[in-house]
Amino acid sequence: MSREILRIATRSSPLAIWQAEYVQQRLESLHEGLRVELVRIKTQGDKILDTPLAKIGGKGLFVKELEEAMMDGRADIAVHSMKDVPMELPPGFALPVICEREDPRDAFVSNTFDGLSSLPHGACVGTSSLRRQAQVKANRPDLVVNSLRGNVQTRLGKLDAGNFDAIILAAAGLKRLEMHDRIRYEMPPEESLPAVGQGAVGIECREGDESTIELLSPLSDVDTWDRVVAERAMNRRLEGGCQVPIAGFALLEDGQLWLRGLVAEEDGSRVLRAEGTAPRGQGAELGIDIAEQLLAQGADEILKALYARQ
């Protein structure tokens, strides 16, 4: 193997560093003599915490500056949370690998209460996600949902300071950071359908960089790939960004994909759902079919109105 050093562009949050170090360790264990270095980047999305993501460019902010590091030669690959990766990559980039998925569910976190149903009338729930907000309000219209941004530790600190009665985070992030004990309740998909790609880590590189793609290929998990492809195909057909109340979650069992999709009003007053199955090799077609079902129910009206307000 001719390459001796591979550089990973990563956000500088603890969870992003965990994900990059996971890839670093896997690559170094697979390829003797390869040294993998981390290039830490504090993105605009990490710096601007007092404004909703939708108003400053969406979650693509977390990806764009890592791509710039690859383009100008500071890094060879970038490691992302798949739920942050835009549906369309810019020209010149490829996403050849999706690693094995961690728990994709949302986690209910509280120091006092055991779940949404146990919260008192008018309790305050924190989340940065319109998808979570919509589903919380659909289940409990009486609750107050306020924006909560920052890394995992920052969000937990705001809960502990008494700013919220409960917060909702991705279970995967808490588990990767060995904070399992903070999870009071893992929310089933029926209560809070996860974000597209939630819990999965993707690796991006320059298009046509075959030597790098060859190094990365053993990290790809085909089951996770097939599930996330179906979820992202649905989101792409809906023309959904990362900061919209869209959920998509695929399971794989006995060679069959089962995809559930959701589009909702921000306030939870209207929730559209669709689901279907297909053989695992037809995930993209399944995703489009579920999106078409949602559009037939009026998803486009909900999304157009949302974009007009943002």
Curated annotation (Swiss-Prot):
GO terms for cellular component: cytoplasm. Its EC number is 2.5.1.61. Its cofactor is dipyrromethane. Keywords: Porphyrin biosynthesis, Transferase. Pathway: Porphyrin-containing compound metabolism; protoporphyrin-IX biosynthesis; coproporphyrinogen-III from 5-aminolevulinate: step 2/4. The modification S-(dipyrrolylmethanemethyl)cysteine is found at residue 242. Binds 1 dipyrromethane group covalently. The keyword Transferase applies. It catalyses: 4 porphobilinogen + H2O = hydroxymethylbilane + 4 NH4(+). It comes from the Bacteria. Disulfide bonds: none annotated. One of its GO terms (molecular function) is hydroxymethylbilane synthase activity. Pfam families: Porphobil_deam, Porphobil_deamC. The keyword Transcription does not apply. The porphobilinogen subunits are added to the dipyrromethane group. Belongs to the HMBS family. Tetrapolymerization of the monopyrrole PBG into the hydroxymethylbilane pre-uroporphyrinogen in several discrete steps. Monomer. HAMAP family: Porphobil_deam. This is Porphobilinogen deaminase.
